[in-house]
Amino acid sequence: MKAIIACLLYVVIQVESNEYYNVTYEPVQRQLLDFKKHHPRPIGLWTKNAGEPVDIRDTITINSDQFSNQLLIDTISTVAGERIPERVVTAKGTGAFGYFEVTHDVSKYTYADVFNGVGKKTPVVVRFASGFQNKGGSDLARDLKTMAVKFYTQEGNLDLLSISIPVFAFRDPMLSRDITHAFNRNPQTNMYDFTSFYDIVTLRPIFAHSLFWLMSDYGIPNGYRKMDAFPVHTYELASKHGEKYYVRFNFRTELGFSYLTTAEAAAIQSLDLDYFTRDLYNAIGSGQYPSWKLEMDVLSLHDLKKVDYNPFDVTTLWKNGTFYTVPIGRLVLNRNVKNHFRDVEQAAYNPGNLVPGIPGPVDYLSCGERMYYRDTQNYRLGRNHNKISVNMPLYEKTYVRDGTPPTNLNMKNAPNYYPNSFHGPVPYVDEHRPWKKLKVLETNAFDLEPAWYFYNYILEDEAHRLRFIANIVLTLVPVTPPVVQRAMKLLHLIDQDLGERVKAGYEVALAAQQALANATPAETMSFRRVPSAEGHPIQMSDPR
């Protein structure tokens, strides 16, 4: 009995001391104790939703008049409404605050205030996510990773939506729904289905190039901090002299790109589905602030007329030797969010959020994105989503009124129509804005050369090719035969060597799967479960 009392006393002393002694806790693990350390006393009286202080006798409702207990009514009536619609894509995510600092003079290319003035700092909020994972899914899926950056500039919010590979899957916005459906859960089984995945890839071979990037070492970066990110679209920039430039932005991690193999990701995933999220939070909480260099690949209007490829095609890379690269500045994340729902779940990023000097992309996919991103945010957050604190620009005066809260000051008593003669907000004339608009005519034809080039030149060595082929084989095993045959044909058309090696690996994997199905329980100990390209386990023999 004395031992038990002593043990309890020790625990109380440990907690009350607010010290960590010789135990090293990660910032993620010590969050609650850190809060207590910064608030030695309770932060105030608990109140009901309307502000009335809570009497301690109302905190227990057994054998009481529950009908008149407003605290109970507040609790029951609000808990069911704590969730908002989950994002259809990029649902599993995290984020942080930081700043962007201009390190190089790029006034030659754009008059955008955010990128002009060496040393200028602009606050940012960044959201990272996995492309097709649900909110409770795995960070370690072989999946597209995203990095959305919101710059709070003096001229409005600038949103750069980036992905972890430098090419996008398609260029026709009409395909957005179908690829989302095919890459998400099957409507009957509610499971990720590689048959639908490869079915749409073989019927729309334009997807092949981005698929190759995902099946390579670039498919699972070693956390968000060690990941490059690419806004993908070709942006039009305008200088103060009326000159136009066409650029592709790149965020290059200053830690250097690092990847996880499928086996490494499987080992981590068995212990921690939130590996990327934990790594980012702990790094910032420990003062190891992640950072990226922002640069842009540049083509002038004159250069544009000489290239022998479509520089606006988001499914392909620009050819080496046709452009030059210009550094702009550094993105640094130095502050974790205080409330995930407020700062990450409610954050709304829109490729249509641009600023003077950056007219933005001119391709058709970008035009489509500006529509469906806005529609998504209206559905998830309401039509006043830009009045939620994390989305609010530094300066805003509009003729938008009312609607579902938040409305904030709702422009108070200012005129609510334009034009008016009573001193409501007025527009200005942007003298530097280009007078002419570039019109890009695109084709729905696809070219297999980018995928061929990736296999032969971007995969830098034989070891990388072997991992790439193994990842493809792993995802083909559960696919039904007719679709597998089309996939094999497509791979053969891209590169004969690739097709033959994938076919050979596929046959070996099928044999291993059959052997496992026929094995005794003791024999199955030589097999283990590893995640597929989407982070969902399938059987294969131990590769060690």
PLM regions with names:
Residues 8-10:
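Extended low-complexity, proline/serine/acidic/glycine-rich cytosolic segments
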